[in-house]
Amino acid sequence: MLEVSEEAIQNALGASYVQDDSFVPIKKIAKGNEEKEAQLLTIPGVMLNDSQDRVYPLGAAAGHLTGYVQAVTAEDLEKLENKGYHANSVIGRSGLEQAYEEELRPVDGTRIIIADETGNTIETLAYQPAQNGKDVRVTIDAEVQKTAYDQFAQDPEQAAAMNPKTGEVLALVSTPGYDPNEFVLGMSDARWNALNEDASNPLMNRFVNTWVPGSTFKGITAAVGVDAGIINPDENLGYVGLSWQKDASWEIIM
């Protein structure tokens, strides 16, 4: 039901911090799936608890653009612990989440207290309130983004749409894509392997790749030449009867 192995569940329940009355998180599920929630609650010992996580409304249509967040790894902590990251932190892994990690990341609150044997606070020694991350506003039009994504569907393509008057980017699409919500909720090994081994490379962000413009750039250089007065638009620069053919100097040496 949750695509979590029995071994993983036993490992979580056997963690050193777990007490008889502890709530041990096993798996995140999307809120609102009432049927699954009802099925889970029929299992003895299972409880549901709300948590605050990223939600990506456009799903796969903007997956490569938004990117996703994940829990920090041990390697992350080695590099970032002095910046306030800890074992329960999340970090942007790709897309806008990664590019604007410093702006989007909230600051955890801290409270240091003296408590009695029953856990009641006697004195607060230090307190730092939590701070939300900043809002980052983009010019992406959700409808344009979804339409562009649907046009290409499963084809390995990329597309961009801009407002020609302002230069604002209205859509950035890479297909096929992936749903970033899967990374937030956690995916099974089988699902991860399927994404990784898919021949169409849904994890590849094609719109950030570089592409050689080739002959499509000739029109631009010609326009610049005409605008600068170097090229006469009425002059025929074509040469009849001449052609180019590669010679031995173009031989590929393996």
Locate the predicted segments by residue.
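A glycine-rich, coil/turn loop motif that links secondary-structure elements
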Residues: E168, T210-P213
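Short hydrophobic alpha-helical segments used for membrane anchoring or interfacial signaling
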Residues: A159-P164
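Short, glycine/proline-biased beta-turn/loop segments that scaffold the active-site neighborhood
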Residues: V173-T175, F183-G186, V212-M254
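Extracytoplasmic/periplasmic proteins that interact with beta-lactams or build/remodel peptidoglycan
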Residues: M1-Q158, V173, Y178-N205, T210
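Residue-level signal for well-ordered, solvent-exposed loop/turn and beta-edge residues enriched
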Residues: N120, G167-E168
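Residue-level preference for non-acidic, small/hydrophobic
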Residues: A38, L65, A148, G167, ...
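Short, internal active-site loops enriched in acidic
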Residues: K165-T166, S243
